[in-house]
Amino acid sequence: MNTQQLAKLRSIVPEMRRVRHIHFVGIGGAGMGGIAEVLANEGYQISGSDLAPNPVTQQLMNLGATIYFNHRPENVRDASVVVVSSAISADNPEIVAAHEARIPVIRRAEMLAELMRFRHGIAIAGTHGKTTTTAMVSSIYAEAGLDPTFVNGGLVKAAGVHARLGHGRYLIAEADESDASFLHLQPMVAIVTNIEADHMDTYQGDFENLKQTFINFLHNLPFYGRAVMCVDDPVIRELLPRVGRQTTTYGFSEDADVRVEDYQQIGPQGHFTLLRQDKEPMRVTLNAPGRHNALNAAAAVAVATEEGIDDEAILRALESFQGTGRRFDFLGEFPLEPVNGKSGTAMLVDDYGHHPTEVDATIKAARAGWPDKNLVMLFQPHRFTRTRDLYDDFANVLTQVDTLLMLEVYPAGEAPIPGADSRSLCRTIRGRGKIDPILVPDPARVAEMLAPVLTGNDLILVQGAGNIGKIARSLAEIKLKPQTPEEEQHD
Protein backbone atom coordinates (compact mmCIF):
# COMPACT_ATOMS: atom_id res chain seq x y z
CA MET A 1 0.00 0.00 0.00
CA ASN A 2 1.48 3.37 -1.00
CA THR A 3 1.64 6.50 1.17
CA GLN A 4 -1.39 8.12 -0.45
CA GLN A 5 -3.53 5.00 -0.01
CA LEU A 6 -2.40 4.65 3.62
CA ALA A 7 -3.31 8.29 4.30
CA LYS A 8 -6.77 7.70 2.84
CA LEU A 9 -7.21 4.64 5.05
CA ARG A 10 -6.12 6.57 8.14
CA SER A 11 -8.93 9.05 7.47
CA ILE A 12 -11.31 6.13 8.01
CA VAL A 13 -9.39 4.02 10.52
CA PRO A 14 -7.07 5.77 13.01
CA GLU A 15 -3.82 4.10 13.97
CA MET A 16 -3.67 2.21 17.24
CA ARG A 17 -1.96 4.60 19.64
CA ARG A 18 1.80 3.99 20.01
CA VAL A 19 1.55 0.48 18.54
CA ARG A 20 4.15 -0.23 15.88
CA HIS A 21 5.28 -3.85 16.23
CA ILE A 22 2.65 -6.61 16.58
CA HIS A 23 3.76 -10.17 17.33
CA PHE A 24 1.50 -13.21 16.78
CA VAL A 25 2.02 -16.49 18.64
CA GLY A 26 0.56 -19.22 16.41
CA ILE A 27 0.65 -17.01 13.32
CA GLY A 28 0.26 -19.91 10.87
CA GLY A 29 -3.39 -20.46 11.74
CA ALA A 30 -5.85 -19.15 9.15
CA GLY A 31 -7.61 -16.80 11.57
CA MET A 32 -4.40 -15.42 13.06
CA GLY A 33 -2.67 -15.11 9.70
CA GLY A 34 -5.62 -13.25 8.22
CA ILE A 35 -5.53 -10.54 10.88
CA ALA A 36 -1.75 -10.32 10.58
CA GLU A 37 -2.12 -9.87 6.81
CA VAL A 38 -4.55 -6.96 7.20
CA LEU A 39 -2.30 -5.28 9.77
CA ALA A 40 0.79 -5.78 7.60
CA ASN A 41 -1.01 -4.04 4.75
CA GLU A 42 -1.97 -1.23 7.14
CA GLY A 43 1.73 -0.57 7.65
CA TYR A 44 2.41 -2.21 11.01
CA GLN A 45 5.59 -4.19 11.65
CA ILE A 46 4.51 -7.83 11.93
CA SER A 47 6.33 -10.76 13.44
CA GLY A 48 5.10 -14.15 14.55
CA SER A 49 5.96 -17.67 15.50
CA ASP A 50 4.70 -21.14 14.68
CA LEU A 51 6.04 -24.66 14.62
CA ALA A 52 6.24 -25.18 10.85
CA PRO A 53 5.94 -23.20 7.62
CA ASN A 54 2.70 -23.31 5.62
CA PRO A 55 1.03 -21.22 2.88
CA VAL A 56 -0.18 -18.68 5.47
CA THR A 57 3.31 -18.02 6.82
CA GLN A 58 4.72 -17.83 3.28
CA GLN A 59 2.14 -15.22 2.30
CA LEU A 60 3.02 -13.15 5.37
CA MET A 61 6.74 -13.43 4.67
CA ASN A 62 6.02 -12.17 1.15
CA LEU A 63 4.48 -9.10 2.81
CA GLY A 64 7.62 -8.49 4.87
CA ALA A 65 6.65 -10.19 8.13
CA THR A 66 9.35 -11.85 10.25
CA ILE A 67 8.37 -15.45 11.04
CA TYR A 68 10.11 -17.69 13.59
CA PHE A 69 9.56 -21.44 13.41
CA ASN A 70 10.08 -21.92 17.11
CA HIS A 71 8.77 -20.46 20.37
CA ARG A 72 11.49 -18.52 22.20
CA PRO A 73 11.38 -15.61 24.66
CA GLU A 74 13.56 -13.43 22.43
CA ASN A 75 10.95 -13.57 19.63
CA VAL A 76 8.78 -11.00 21.44
CA ARG A 77 11.62 -8.52 21.95
CA ASP A 78 10.52 -4.97 21.05
CA ALA A 79 6.90 -6.00 20.42
CA SER A 80 4.24 -3.41 21.28
CA VAL A 81 1.61 -6.11 21.76
CA VAL A 82 1.46 -9.91 21.57
CA VAL A 83 -1.57 -11.62 20.00
CA VAL A 84 -2.24 -15.26 20.90
CA SER A 85 -4.53 -17.90 19.44
CA SER A 86 -6.74 -20.02 21.67
CA ALA A 87 -4.56 -23.04 20.85
CA ILE A 88 -1.55 -21.52 22.69
CA SER A 89 -1.06 -22.45 26.35
CA ALA A 90 -0.35 -19.85 29.02
CA ASP A 91 3.09 -21.36 29.74
CA ASN A 92 4.33 -20.73 26.20
CA PRO A 93 7.78 -19.11 26.61
CA GLU A 94 6.83 -16.13 24.44
CA ILE A 95 3.73 -15.40 26.51
CA VAL A 96 5.70 -15.74 29.74
CA ALA A 97 8.38 -13.38 28.38
CA ALA A 98 5.75 -10.86 27.27
CA HIS A 99 4.17 -10.80 30.72
CA GLU A 100 7.58 -10.36 32.35
CA ALA A 101 8.34 -7.44 30.01
CA ARG A 102 4.87 -5.94 30.67
CA ILE A 103 3.92 -6.23 27.01
CA PRO A 104 0.13 -6.50 26.56
CA VAL A 105 -1.02 -10.02 25.64
CA ILE A 106 -4.39 -10.20 23.90
CA ARG A 107 -6.48 -12.83 22.15
CA ARG A 108 -7.03 -12.90 18.42
CA ALA A 109 -10.63 -11.68 18.69
CA GLU A 110 -9.55 -8.59 20.64
CA MET A 111 -7.34 -7.52 17.75
CA LEU A 112 -10.13 -8.29 15.29
CA ALA A 113 -12.44 -6.13 17.40
CA GLU A 114 -9.90 -3.30 17.19
CA LEU A 115 -9.86 -3.59 13.40
CA MET A 116 -13.66 -3.46 13.44
CA ARG A 117 -13.93 -0.54 15.86
CA PHE A 118 -13.82 2.24 13.27
CA ARG A 119 -15.44 0.33 10.43
CA HIS A 120 -18.93 -0.90 9.59
CA GLY A 121 -18.50 -4.43 10.92
CA ILE A 122 -20.33 -7.48 9.58
CA ALA A 123 -19.67 -10.58 11.71
CA ILE A 124 -20.67 -14.10 10.66
CA ALA A 125 -21.17 -16.61 13.48
CA GLY A 126 -22.68 -20.08 13.86
CA THR A 127 -21.64 -23.69 14.28
CA HIS A 128 -21.54 -24.40 10.53
CA GLY A 129 -21.22 -22.34 7.37
CA LYS A 130 -19.33 -19.33 8.77
CA THR A 131 -16.39 -19.45 6.39
CA THR A 132 -18.42 -19.88 3.21
CA THR A 133 -20.98 -17.24 4.23
CA THR A 134 -18.17 -14.79 5.04
CA ALA A 135 -16.72 -15.39 1.57
CA MET A 136 -20.13 -14.90 -0.07
CA VAL A 137 -20.78 -11.60 1.71
CA SER A 138 -17.26 -10.43 0.84
CA SER A 139 -17.73 -11.41 -2.82
CA ILE A 140 -21.03 -9.53 -3.10
CA TYR A 141 -19.63 -6.37 -1.49
CA ALA A 142 -16.56 -6.52 -3.74
CA GLU A 143 -18.71 -7.04 -6.84
CA ALA A 144 -20.75 -3.98 -5.82
CA GLY A 145 -17.57 -1.87 -5.79
CA LEU A 146 -17.56 -1.34 -2.01
CA ASP A 147 -13.96 -2.62 -1.61
CA PRO A 148 -14.44 -4.29 1.79
CA THR A 149 -11.81 -5.51 4.20
CA PHE A 150 -12.40 -9.18 5.00
CA VAL A 151 -10.90 -11.61 7.50
CA ASN A 152 -11.92 -15.22 6.94
CA GLY A 153 -11.13 -18.54 8.59
CA GLY A 154 -10.52 -20.17 5.22
CA LEU A 155 -9.01 -19.34 1.87
CA VAL A 156 -11.23 -17.13 -0.29
CA LYS A 157 -10.38 -18.78 -3.59
CA ALA A 158 -11.28 -15.83 -5.83
CA ALA A 159 -8.85 -13.61 -3.92
CA GLY A 160 -6.26 -16.31 -3.20
CA VAL A 161 -5.97 -15.13 0.43
CA HIS A 162 -7.68 -15.54 3.82
CA ALA A 163 -7.87 -11.79 4.37
CA ARG A 164 -7.61 -8.60 2.40
CA LEU A 165 -7.38 -4.93 3.33
CA GLY A 166 -9.88 -2.81 1.41
CA HIS A 167 -10.25 0.95 1.22
CA GLY A 168 -13.98 0.95 1.95
CA ARG A 169 -15.67 1.33 5.32
CA TYR A 170 -16.80 -2.31 5.62
CA LEU A 171 -15.07 -5.09 7.55
CA ILE A 172 -16.52 -8.57 7.01
CA ALA A 173 -15.24 -11.17 9.44
CA GLU A 174 -15.81 -14.73 10.56
CA ALA A 175 -16.72 -14.75 14.27
CA ASP A 176 -15.42 -17.74 16.22
CA GLU A 177 -17.54 -19.15 19.04
CA SER A 178 -15.16 -22.02 19.84
CA ASP A 179 -13.56 -20.11 22.74
CA ALA A 180 -16.36 -17.52 23.19
CA SER A 181 -13.95 -14.82 22.05
CA PHE A 182 -16.49 -13.48 19.54
CA LEU A 183 -17.94 -11.60 22.50
CA HIS A 184 -15.15 -9.04 21.96
CA LEU A 185 -16.68 -8.03 18.62
CA GLN A 186 -19.08 -5.11 18.27
CA PRO A 187 -20.38 -5.30 14.70
CA MET A 188 -23.17 -3.38 13.03
CA VAL A 189 -24.60 -6.54 11.45
CA ALA A 190 -24.34 -10.12 12.70
CA ILE A 191 -25.30 -13.33 10.91
CA VAL A 192 -25.96 -16.51 12.92
CA THR A 193 -26.19 -19.52 10.61
CA ASN A 194 -27.12 -22.20 13.18
CA ILE A 195 -26.34 -23.28 16.75
CA GLU A 196 -25.39 -26.83 17.72
CA ALA A 197 -23.53 -28.43 20.59
CA ASP A 198 -19.85 -28.12 19.68
CA HIS A 199 -16.77 -26.93 21.59
CA MET A 200 -18.73 -27.74 24.72
CA ASP A 201 -15.60 -27.73 26.90
CA THR A 202 -15.64 -23.92 26.50
CA TYR A 203 -19.21 -23.83 27.82
CA GLN A 204 -18.74 -26.21 30.76
CA GLY A 205 -20.76 -28.84 28.92
CA ASP A 206 -23.89 -26.69 29.28
CA PHE A 207 -25.85 -26.09 26.07
CA GLU A 208 -27.88 -23.35 27.76
CA ASN A 209 -24.60 -21.55 28.42
CA LEU A 210 -23.73 -21.79 24.72
CA LYS A 211 -27.14 -20.43 23.69
CA GLN A 212 -26.89 -17.52 26.12
CA THR A 213 -23.44 -16.70 24.78
CA PHE A 214 -24.89 -16.33 21.28
CA ILE A 215 -27.59 -14.03 22.69
CA ASN A 216 -24.87 -11.97 24.39
CA PHE A 217 -22.97 -11.79 21.09
CA LEU A 218 -26.06 -10.44 19.31
CA HIS A 219 -26.62 -7.92 22.08
CA ASN A 220 -23.20 -6.46 21.25
CA LEU A 221 -24.98 -5.00 18.22
CA PRO A 222 -26.12 -1.39 18.67
CA PHE A 223 -29.87 -0.96 18.97
CA TYR A 224 -29.89 0.19 15.33
CA GLY A 225 -27.86 -2.83 14.18
CA ARG A 226 -29.34 -5.95 12.66
CA ALA A 227 -29.22 -9.68 13.42
CA VAL A 228 -29.67 -11.98 10.40
CA MET A 229 -30.64 -15.47 11.57
CA CYS A 230 -31.56 -18.81 9.99
CA VAL A 231 -35.09 -19.61 11.12
CA ASP A 232 -34.80 -23.20 9.83
CA ASP A 233 -32.54 -23.93 12.79
CA PRO A 234 -34.68 -25.03 15.77
CA VAL A 235 -32.36 -23.46 18.34
CA ILE A 236 -32.38 -20.11 16.55
CA ARG A 237 -36.17 -20.25 16.28
CA GLU A 238 -36.31 -20.85 20.02
CA LEU A 239 -33.98 -17.93 20.75
CA LEU A 240 -35.56 -15.35 18.44
CA PRO A 241 -37.93 -13.91 21.10
CA ARG A 242 -34.90 -13.28 23.34
CA VAL A 243 -33.01 -11.22 20.74
CA GLY A 244 -33.55 -7.58 21.63
CA ARG A 245 -32.37 -6.25 18.28
CA GLN A 246 -33.81 -5.77 14.81
CA THR A 247 -33.84 -9.14 13.08
CA THR A 248 -34.12 -10.54 9.57
CA THR A 249 -34.76 -14.26 9.23
CA TYR A 250 -33.89 -16.49 6.31
CA GLY A 251 -34.40 -20.12 5.34
CA PHE A 252 -36.62 -22.58 3.53
CA SER A 253 -39.34 -22.03 6.16
CA GLU A 254 -42.51 -20.34 4.94
CA ASP A 255 -42.27 -17.60 7.59
CA ALA A 256 -38.69 -16.60 6.68
CA ASP A 257 -38.19 -12.94 5.72
CA VAL A 258 -35.79 -14.10 2.99
CA ARG A 259 -37.16 -17.42 1.79
CA VAL A 260 -35.49 -20.06 -0.39
CA GLU A 261 -37.80 -22.03 -2.65
CA ASP A 262 -37.68 -24.23 -5.78
CA TYR A 263 -34.17 -25.47 -5.02
CA GLN A 264 -32.53 -27.67 -7.65
CA GLN A 265 -28.95 -28.84 -7.92
CA ILE A 266 -27.34 -29.57 -11.27
CA GLY A 267 -23.78 -30.79 -10.81
CA PRO A 268 -21.85 -28.24 -8.72
CA GLN A 269 -24.45 -25.46 -9.05
CA GLY A 270 -27.59 -24.69 -7.08
CA HIS A 271 -30.59 -23.00 -8.70
CA PHE A 272 -33.32 -21.47 -6.56
CA THR A 273 -35.61 -18.50 -6.02
CA LEU A 274 -35.30 -16.03 -3.14
CA LEU A 275 -38.46 -14.31 -1.95
CA ARG A 276 -37.90 -11.05 -0.07
CA GLN A 277 -40.36 -8.66 1.50
CA ASP A 278 -41.30 -5.78 -0.83
CA LYS A 279 -38.90 -7.03 -3.52
CA GLU A 280 -39.23 -8.88 -6.78
CA PRO A 281 -38.39 -12.61 -6.58
CA MET A 282 -34.70 -13.22 -7.24
CA ARG A 283 -33.79 -16.24 -9.37
CA VAL A 284 -30.32 -17.32 -8.25
CA THR A 285 -27.67 -19.48 -9.86
CA LEU A 286 -25.15 -20.29 -7.14
CA ASN A 287 -21.78 -21.74 -8.05
CA ALA A 288 -21.70 -23.94 -4.93
CA PRO A 289 -23.53 -27.23 -4.36
CA GLY A 290 -25.99 -28.19 -1.65
CA ARG A 291 -29.04 -26.84 0.14
CA HIS A 292 -26.77 -25.69 2.98
CA ASN A 293 -25.00 -23.36 0.56
CA ALA A 294 -28.35 -21.98 -0.62
CA LEU A 295 -28.94 -21.02 3.02
CA ASN A 296 -25.51 -19.41 3.22
CA ALA A 297 -26.32 -17.43 0.09
CA ALA A 298 -29.69 -16.37 1.52
CA ALA A 299 -27.90 -14.93 4.56
CA ALA A 300 -25.49 -13.01 2.33
CA VAL A 301 -28.35 -11.71 0.18
CA ALA A 302 -30.29 -10.60 3.27
CA VAL A 303 -27.31 -8.50 4.42
CA ALA A 304 -26.64 -7.09 0.96
CA THR A 305 -30.30 -6.21 0.41
CA GLU A 306 -30.40 -4.39 3.74
CA GLU A 307 -27.37 -2.38 2.64
CA GLY A 308 -29.07 -1.45 -0.64
CA ILE A 309 -26.77 -3.37 -2.97
CA ASP A 310 -28.45 -3.85 -6.35
CA ASP A 311 -29.67 -7.29 -7.36
CA GLU A 312 -27.49 -7.44 -10.46
CA ALA A 313 -24.29 -7.24 -8.41
CA ILE A 314 -25.61 -9.86 -5.98
CA LEU A 315 -26.48 -12.27 -8.79
CA ARG A 316 -23.13 -11.80 -10.56
CA ALA A 317 -21.23 -12.50 -7.34
CA LEU A 318 -23.16 -15.68 -6.55
CA GLU A 319 -23.01 -17.09 -10.08
CA SER A 320 -19.24 -16.54 -10.26
CA PHE A 321 -18.57 -17.56 -6.63
CA GLN A 322 -15.39 -19.63 -6.50
CA GLY A 323 -15.84 -20.97 -3.00
CA THR A 324 -13.39 -21.33 -0.16
CA GLY A 325 -10.49 -23.65 0.45
CA ARG A 326 -11.42 -27.15 1.61
CA ARG A 327 -15.19 -26.57 1.30
CA PHE A 328 -16.37 -29.05 -1.37
CA ASP A 329 -13.08 -28.22 -3.05
CA PHE A 330 -12.88 -29.94 -6.45
CA LEU A 331 -9.30 -31.17 -6.93
CA GLY A 332 -9.74 -32.89 -10.26
CA GLU A 333 -11.12 -35.86 -12.17
CA PHE A 334 -8.56 -38.56 -12.85
CA PRO A 335 -8.44 -41.56 -15.19
CA LEU A 336 -8.10 -44.85 -13.35
CA GLU A 337 -5.74 -47.69 -14.07
CA PRO A 338 -7.76 -50.82 -14.88
CA VAL A 339 -8.36 -52.78 -11.67
CA ASN A 340 -9.97 -56.21 -12.05
CA GLY A 341 -10.87 -55.19 -15.59
CA LYS A 342 -12.47 -51.90 -14.47
CA SER A 343 -11.44 -48.50 -15.81
CA GLY A 344 -12.97 -45.03 -15.96
CA THR A 345 -12.53 -41.90 -13.88
CA ALA A 346 -12.83 -40.71 -10.30
CA MET A 347 -13.63 -37.18 -9.11
CA LEU A 348 -11.69 -36.00 -6.05
CA VAL A 349 -13.28 -33.52 -3.63
CA ASP A 350 -11.69 -32.17 -0.44
CA ASP A 351 -13.94 -30.95 2.39
CA TYR A 352 -13.18 -29.55 5.84
CA GLY A 353 -16.47 -30.63 7.46
CA HIS A 354 -15.79 -32.54 10.68
CA HIS A 355 -19.11 -32.35 12.57
CA PRO A 356 -21.88 -34.87 11.70
CA THR A 357 -24.14 -32.09 10.42
CA GLU A 358 -21.40 -30.83 8.09
CA VAL A 359 -20.54 -34.33 6.86
CA ASP A 360 -24.23 -35.00 6.22
CA ALA A 361 -24.56 -31.78 4.19
CA THR A 362 -21.53 -32.71 2.07
CA ILE A 363 -22.87 -36.20 1.38
CA LYS A 364 -26.29 -34.82 0.41
CA ALA A 365 -24.67 -32.28 -1.95
CA ALA A 366 -22.64 -35.05 -3.58
CA ARG A 367 -25.70 -37.30 -3.99
CA ALA A 368 -27.82 -34.45 -5.41
CA GLY A 369 -25.24 -33.28 -7.93
CA TRP A 370 -23.86 -36.65 -9.01
CA PRO A 371 -26.57 -39.22 -8.25
CA ASP A 372 -25.06 -41.96 -10.42
CA LYS A 373 -21.60 -41.83 -8.85
CA ASN A 374 -20.16 -44.44 -6.51
CA LEU A 375 -19.64 -42.33 -3.38
CA VAL A 376 -16.39 -43.14 -1.57
CA MET A 377 -15.42 -41.27 1.59
CA LEU A 378 -12.01 -41.07 3.23
CA PHE A 379 -12.82 -39.74 6.70
CA GLN A 380 -10.55 -38.58 9.51
CA PRO A 381 -12.35 -37.96 12.83
CA HIS A 382 -11.18 -34.76 14.53
CA ARG A 383 -10.59 -34.81 18.30
CA PHE A 384 -11.34 -37.68 20.66
CA THR A 385 -13.79 -35.54 22.65
CA ARG A 386 -15.87 -34.73 19.56
CA THR A 387 -15.83 -38.39 18.49
CA ARG A 388 -17.02 -39.40 21.97
CA ASP A 389 -19.70 -36.71 22.28
CA LEU A 390 -21.15 -37.22 18.78
CA TYR A 391 -20.37 -40.92 18.38
CA ASP A 392 -23.86 -42.12 17.40
CA ASP A 393 -24.38 -39.17 15.07
CA PHE A 394 -21.14 -39.98 13.25
CA ALA A 395 -22.11 -43.65 12.99
CA ASN A 396 -25.49 -42.73 11.48
CA VAL A 397 -24.16 -40.17 8.99
CA LEU A 398 -21.21 -42.20 7.74
CA THR A 399 -23.43 -45.13 6.71
CA GLN A 400 -24.84 -42.95 3.89
CA VAL A 401 -21.80 -43.41 1.62
CA ASP A 402 -21.20 -46.45 -0.58
CA THR A 403 -17.68 -47.11 0.68
CA LEU A 404 -15.98 -45.72 3.79
CA LEU A 405 -12.26 -45.63 4.54
CA MET A 406 -11.35 -44.20 7.92
CA LEU A 407 -8.06 -42.84 9.23
CA GLU A 408 -7.16 -42.76 12.91
CA VAL A 409 -8.57 -39.86 14.94
CA TYR A 410 -6.64 -36.61 14.53
CA PRO A 411 -6.01 -35.76 18.21
CA ALA A 412 -5.44 -31.98 17.99
CA GLY A 413 -3.46 -32.23 21.21
CA GLU A 414 -5.97 -34.41 23.08
CA ALA A 415 -5.21 -37.66 24.88
CA PRO A 416 -6.93 -40.81 23.54
CA ILE A 417 -10.31 -41.72 25.03
CA PRO A 418 -11.22 -45.43 25.21
CA GLY A 419 -14.07 -46.25 22.83
CA ALA A 420 -13.78 -42.92 20.99
CA ASP A 421 -11.29 -44.13 18.39
CA SER A 422 -11.59 -44.99 14.72
CA ARG A 423 -11.43 -48.76 15.25
CA SER A 424 -14.42 -48.62 17.60
CA LEU A 425 -16.34 -46.36 15.23
CA CYS A 426 -15.67 -48.72 12.30
CA ARG A 427 -16.88 -51.65 14.41
CA THR A 428 -20.10 -49.83 15.31
CA ILE A 429 -20.80 -48.86 11.69
CA ARG A 430 -20.11 -52.42 10.51
CA GLY A 431 -22.56 -53.72 13.10
CA ARG A 432 -25.35 -51.66 11.56
CA GLY A 433 -25.11 -53.80 8.45
CA LYS A 434 -25.17 -51.14 5.71
CA ILE A 435 -21.49 -50.80 4.80
CA ASP A 436 -18.23 -52.47 5.77
CA PRO A 437 -15.79 -49.65 6.67
CA ILE A 438 -12.08 -50.02 6.06
CA LEU A 439 -9.65 -48.79 8.72
CA VAL A 440 -6.53 -47.19 7.21
CA PRO A 441 -3.79 -47.63 9.84
CA ASP A 442 -1.15 -45.63 7.96
CA PRO A 443 -1.83 -42.47 5.90
CA ALA A 444 0.94 -43.54 3.53
CA ARG A 445 -1.25 -46.47 2.46
CA VAL A 446 -4.31 -44.41 1.47
CA ALA A 447 -3.80 -44.63 -2.31
CA GLU A 448 -3.00 -48.35 -2.08
CA MET A 449 -6.15 -49.11 -0.04
CA LEU A 450 -8.33 -46.77 -2.10
CA ALA A 451 -7.57 -48.27 -5.52
CA PRO A 452 -9.38 -51.63 -5.11
CA VAL A 453 -12.70 -50.06 -4.05
CA LEU A 454 -12.99 -47.71 -7.04
CA THR A 455 -15.42 -48.67 -9.82
CA GLY A 456 -14.49 -46.22 -12.58
CA ASN A 457 -17.48 -43.98 -11.89
CA ASP A 458 -16.53 -42.58 -8.51
CA LEU A 459 -16.75 -39.44 -6.43
CA ILE A 460 -14.18 -39.50 -3.64
CA LEU A 461 -14.85 -37.23 -0.66
CA VAL A 462 -11.79 -36.57 1.49
CA GLN A 463 -13.41 -35.37 4.70
CA GLY A 464 -12.09 -33.87 7.95
CA ALA A 465 -10.33 -31.01 9.71
CA GLY A 466 -6.98 -32.51 10.67
CA ASN A 467 -4.05 -33.13 8.34
CA ILE A 468 -6.28 -34.96 5.87
CA GLY A 469 -6.25 -31.93 3.55
CA LYS A 470 -2.58 -32.66 2.84
CA ILE A 471 -3.52 -36.25 2.02
CA ALA A 472 -6.15 -34.98 -0.44
CA ARG A 473 -3.57 -32.81 -2.19
CA SER A 474 -1.07 -35.67 -2.34
CA LEU A 475 -3.73 -37.92 -3.90
CA ALA A 476 -4.31 -35.24 -6.54
CA GLU A 477 -0.57 -34.93 -7.19
CA ILE A 478 -0.19 -38.67 -7.83
CA LYS A 479 -3.54 -38.76 -9.71
CA LEU A 480 -4.85 -41.40 -7.26
CA LYS A 481 -2.26 -43.94 -8.41
CA PRO A 482 -0.56 -46.01 -5.71
CA GLN A 483 3.17 -45.33 -5.70
CA THR A 484 5.80 -48.05 -5.98
CA PRO A 485 8.72 -47.89 -3.51
CA GLU A 486 10.93 -46.65 -6.36
CA GLU A 487 8.49 -43.83 -7.19
CA GLU A 488 8.19 -42.83 -3.53
CA GLN A 489 11.98 -42.71 -3.22
CA HIS A 490 12.20 -40.64 -6.42
CA ASP A 491 9.57 -38.21 -5.10
Curated annotation (Swiss-Prot):
The entry marks the following residues as binding ATP, namely: G126, T127, H128, G129, K130, T131, T132
Q: Which HAMAP family match?
A: MurC
Organism superkingdom = Bacteria
Task: Give GO MF terms, alphabetically.
Answer: ATP binding; magnesium ion binding; protein homodimerization activity; UDP-N-acetylmuramate-L-alanine ligase activity
The alphabetized list of GO BP terms reads: cell division; cell wall organization; peptidoglycan biosynthetic process; regulation of cell shape
Q: What is its EC number?
A: 6.3.2.8
Location comes to:
Cytoplasm
Which keywords annotate this record? ATP-binding, Cell cycle, Cell division, Cell shape, Cell wall biogenesis/degradation, Cytoplasm, Ligase, Nucleotide-binding, Peptidoglycan synthesis
Described by its record, this protein's role is as follows: Cell wall formation.
Q: What pathway is this protein said to act in by its record?
A: Cell wall biogenesis; peptidoglycan biosynthesis
The pH profile of the activity is: Optimum pH is 8.6.
* The protein, known as: UDP-N-acetylmuramate--L-alanine ligase
- What are the record's GO terms for cellular component? cytoplasm
The reaction(s) this protein catalyses: UDP-N-acetyl-alpha-D-muramate + L-alanine + ATP = UDP-N-acetyl-alpha-D-muramoyl-L-alanine + ADP + phosphate + H(+)
Q: Does Cell division count among this protein's keywords?
A: yes
According to the entry, what is the taxonomic lineage of the organism? Bacteria, Pseudomonadati, Pseudomonadota, Gammaproteobacteria, Enterobacterales
Xref: SUPFAM superfamilies: MurCD N-terminal domain, MurD-like peptide ligases, catalytic domain, MurD-like peptide ligases, peptide-binding domain
Organism the protein comes from? Escherichia coli (strain K12)
Q: Which family does the record assign?
A: Belongs to the MurCDEF family.
Q: Quote the temperature dependence note.
A: Optimum temperature is 45 degrees Celsius.
| EC main group | ligase
